[in-house]
């Protein structure tokens, strides 16, 4: 491919990515650090963004990916908490990666923010098991359950995998008034 037809490269900077309102899509090839980036963005949303873990929705494709995300987010929050606490006690903390080191240097020196963020991270870690870190299907299932009372739908909806049964029922409902 010649230079004229090349797409410009986008380098994702986890500490610079905007946190403003709206949807975010993180899309990249396998092994490029999506889980790492998401875990760091969750950290930033909980601290810099002032969000609570219950306000976030993290969706992926498979159960194993959701479990890995939950684990990595928890680890990231724990590492950030240790780093912020080391600033509080003026002791050295070597984080496991340069992105977290940079974040701690940029953000950790402000003592009023730091104390607030320590509390926020502790609360987030306590609520991590209940956080919306799920698959697309899990998100839909949970949304249907939450909306069941308002919509009058079943509280625990089941997916009808029988195409014939569904088509037959639909045909009978449409044709029965005429026969």
What do the PLM-derived regions correspond to, one by one?
Residues 11, 160-161:
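Ser/Thr-centered flexible coil motifs
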Residues 1, 163-164:
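Extended hydrophobic/Leu-rich segments
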Residues 164, 168-179:
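Positively charged, low-complexity/disordered segments
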Residues 149-158:
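Short hinge/gating elements
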Residues 1-150:
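P-loop NTPase Walker
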Residues 133, 159-160:
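Conserved AAA+ ATPase "SRH/arginine-finger" region at the nucleotide-binding site
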